[in-house]
Amino acid sequence: MLRVARIMKCLTSSKAAALDAELMAPSGGFSIDQLMELAGLSVAQAVYKYDKSLAQGKQVLVLVGPGNNGGDGLVAARHLCHLGAKPVIYYPKRTDRPLFNGLVTQLHNLDIKFLDDVNKSTFDSSAHVIDSLFGFSFKPPIREPFPKVIELLKETKTPTTSVDIPSSWDVDRGPEDDNAFQPSSLVSLTAPKGASRHLLPSTRHFLGGRFVSKHIADKYDLEVPAYEGLDHIVELTQNNKEAQI
C-alpha cells in the first residue's frame, strides 16, 4: 500500500537552487551523477505506482530536455525498462557532456528506441508520457523545437507524469494561464516547489527525496516524510497551501 503523507511546505526557486548547490558542495558530498540517479529512480517508481500495468511491455514516451531534468528522464527510462516497460525517447536537443552521453549509451545498450520526431500518434500509441523537458531553472520563452511538444502535452489524453515542475510553468507562480498543460501526476524532487500549489485536485503528487539529511532538512525547514519499505517516493496530499520557504 502506498503511504500518503500530509501536506508539505514548498521551496522557492532560489531556495531550491541553493539547496542543490549545497548538496553538491564539498560539505554536501553528493555528485550530480548521484542526484540524477536518485531522481530518475524516484520518477520511475512513481510512474510504476501510477500504473503497474506498464510493466507488461507497454510503451512509455519519455520527453527529454537539454538540462538536468532531461537527465532525470533518461535515468527513469532505464529503470522502467528493467521493470518491464517499453520506453521510447524523444531527445531533440542533446547535451554533449560525458554524464549525458553515458546515459544515452546505457539506453542504446538496452535497445531503447530514440525518436526523430513526435506527433499526436506518438502520444496516442503510448500508455504513459514522462515530461522531463524543463526543471526548476526554466526561464521563458520556450524555444524550438519544444513549443510543439508543449502543445501536444496540452492536448493528449494519455496519462502524463512531470518531473519536478510541469514543463512551461513558472517554478514559483505555476501555469501562465488556464490553458496551460496540466500533468496527471507530478514527482517533486527533494521538496515540492511553489508551482505544485496549482496542480488540479485530481493530480497525483509524489515526492522523491529519500536522501535528505537532518542537517539539510533543518537548515531549509524541510519536512521529511516517512517512506515505506524500499520506496524512494511518498505520495503527498493535494491542495498544498503552505507558505513558501
Swiss-Prot record:
SUPFAM superfamilies: YjeF N-terminal domain-like. Binds 1 potassium ion per subunit. It holds the Pfam family YjeF_N. Residues 16-224 form the YjeF N-terminal domain. K(+) binds at N69, D131, S167. One of its GO terms (molecular function) is metal ion binding. Its cofactor is K(+). The keyword Cell cycle does not apply. Keywords: Cytoplasm, Isomerase, Metal-binding, Mitochondrion, NAD, NADP, Nucleotide-binding, Potassium. (6S)-NADPHX binds at N68, N69, G70, G71, D72, G135, F136, S137, F138, K139, P140, P141, D164. Its EC number is 5.1.99.6. One of its GO terms (cellular component) is mitochondrion. It is found in: Cytoplasm; Mitochondrion. The keyword S-adenosyl-L-methionine does not apply. Belongs to the NnrE/AIBP family. Catalyzes the epimerization of the S- and R-forms of NAD(P)HX, a damaged form of NAD(P)H that is a result of enzymatic or heat-dependent hydration. This is a prerequisite for the S-specific NAD(P)H-hydrate dehydratase to allow the repair of both epimers of NAD(P)HX. This is NAD(P)H-hydrate epimerase. It comes from Yarrowia lipolytica (strain CLIB 122 / E 150) (Yeast).
